[in-house]
Amino acid sequence: MEVSGPEDDPFLSQLHQVQCPVCQQMMPAAHINSHLDRCLLLHPAGHAEPAAGSHRAGERAKGPSPPGAKRRRLSESSALKQPATPTAAESSEGEGEEGDDGGETESRESYDAPPTPSGARLIPDFPVARSSSPGRKGSGKRPAAAAAAGSASPRSWDEAEAQEEEEAVGDGDGDGDADADGEDDPGHWDADAAEAATAFGASGGGRPHPRALAAEEIRQMLQGKPLADTMRPDTLQDYFGQSKAVGQDTLLRSLLETNEIPSLILWGPPGCGKTTLAHIIASNSKKHSIRFVTLSATNAKTNDVRDVIKQAQNEKSFFKRKTILFIDEIHRFNKSQQDTFLPHVECGTITLIGATTENPSFQVNAALLSRCRVIVLEKLPVEAMVTILMRAINSLGIHVLDSSRPTDPLSHSSNSSSEPAMFIEDKAVDTLAYLSDGDARAGLNGLQLAVLARLSSRKMFCKKSGQSYSPSRVLITENDVKEGLQRSHILYDRAGEEHYNCISALHKSMRGSDQNASLYWLARMLEGGEDPLYVARRLVRFASEDIGLADPSALTQAVAAYQGCHFIGMPECEVLLAQCVVYFARAPKSIEVYSAYNNVKACLRNHQGPLPPVPLHLRNAPTRLMKDLGYGKGYKYNPMYSEPVDQEYLPEELRGVDFFKQRRC
Ligand SMILES: Nc1ncnc2c1ncn2[C@@H]1O[C@H](COP(=O)(O)OP(=O)(O)OP(=O)(O)O)[C@@H](O)[C@H]1O
């Protein structure tokens, strides 16, 4: 069976929903990252809602609920509530719901905390890593938002309210007391953070130290723009982890360095750097007076493309200027829209750079594809993710705490105003890098959310406990970053490719009778938020295609599993699927029927000329005329014979063909 075709079930496509951790809005999992980019712009830090995750943290003995612990239950109402999603690849998840099964939680926990290999720290010797100079990037360049924050900009809501609180409470308790009361904190002020704050020398009842401003500064930097955008590199020097595509000795790199840009299709999973590479090409081409025009296939119309082409023609003929046209998500253009570029790419009016998360062999016109070089970008490796995160952490002036040196925090207990106000555990950086699953945008968004949520929860705690608001010496722990990530849409590709890869791996593992691998691929899909009914439908197919008559009850099992999933939904139905998958992996296999049927189909498709008529004796003869024409004549009614009947059932010209013996006609 081929499992690479799109899964198009509009009903199910409405179910694959996740919740935005900032605005709490439900949406298709595929949209969460782009939504977060917008949402972070719209919602100031004080409005982020870390409490949702934190509440769960309080309710569950095992600590904060990992994002991936979101459970789904299929229900009609959930389906009705959700808007339809545009593509099937983005479909198929139900409403998030907390699972309460202990065993299940345990397995998720182990997923959430991937071990660092042999306990080694991954944080590299980044040029500016662990420096304590707030607000500066590795390059020494300060992000615009930081610069603005440093100036006499209007004060934010949080800042003003914090000041008010301070005035109301007076010169009250400091952070030291906060530690003691940590258990009352509805937010994130958990034991480890309190401990660390004490270790930093944050105890004592003094007023907030001027260092608090640095935390404010960080918050303002993050409020203005998604961190992923702020950190988007302009040069290949800051572009990490894609050495196969643009490493030192690659053809593409030399072409970029000599500014000979061919038409390109950049293919890779979300957040791996497709747009960023185009951005780097753009920065480079501007230096060489090449026009760089960007369109997104999600909203551009064919006319927009025509306009760009027309202008490119003018620029070429009047000013001898080249135009590079970057089309994000090019797979969203249909075939005829893609045809619009074809002659213009061919004659060099435009250099096309398309970015796609989908396999271009299926999604991009063959003719267009043959005129472009396909660059395959991969999920960013963990080391590259750490480097990217460290670049951001340094630009925010956040200090990384070395967990192998427990005295480290103490060394920051002086009152120097140049000290960093915010700290992050090194293992938190590692965890973020792991859980981001090669998606730099997800990692940077996760970092941004963790920082904002930490600042915001600290503020909430101060408000509740009547203490003065002092965002100085805030510690970001591993748990904070886990909450900053929505694991369900990170471990499992929301754009489609991984969806088909995983179901294909499951199918092949069952076919190969590998029950371990079968269970692994099943869990990987379900834990990633796959729709259980999608998996169940595939099992129904497998039952006939691969097991067939070797064990006809497999089909009954699969249909029962499908119905069971339909009745009880996730998380309860996962064990039904697991049982079925293991049954199938262990079952004897037979493709006899499947291949014989394929032989019949091939026979029909390859037939030249009109198909042979149905033999007269096999035809029904409900009227006299038909009887007169010979319909049904000579037909031997089998029940009337005690012996096997010698009778031909195939058309005359197929006599002797045996589809079960691989004979094709
Ligand atoms: N290789 C990389 N090196 C450094 N930073 C990166 C890299 N890849 C991505 N990033 C960071 O992640 C952010 C998102 O990356 P980008 O927009 O390029 O992803 P994409 O592959 O185009 O994703 P999508 O398919 O979802 O549009 C960038 O703004 C940048 O900050």
Curated annotation (Swiss-Prot):
Residues recorded with modification N6-acetyllysine: K633
GO biological-process terms attached to the record: DNA synthesis involved in DNA repair; DNA-templated DNA replication; innate immune response; regulation of DNA-templated DNA replication initiation
Variant or mutagenesis effect after changing L36A: Loss of affinity for ubiquitin
Reported effect, L42A: Normal affinity for ubiquitin
Position of the Glycyl lysine isopeptide (Lys-Gly) (interchain with G-Cter in ubiquitin) cross-link: K81, K141, K225, K301, K310, K316, K322, K335, K482, K627, K633, K636
Tissues where this protein is expressed: Ubiquitously expressed.
Assembly and interaction partners: Forms homooligomers, possibly octamers. Directly interacts with POLD1, POLD2 and POLD4. Interacts with the N-terminal domain of WRN. Interacts (via UBZ4-type zinc finger) with monoubiquitin and polyubiquitin. Interacts with TRIM14 and PPP6C; these interactions positively regulate the RIGI signaling pathway.
Protein's UniProt name: ATPase WRNIP1
Lineage, top ranks: Eukaryota, Metazoa, Chordata, Craniata, Vertebrata
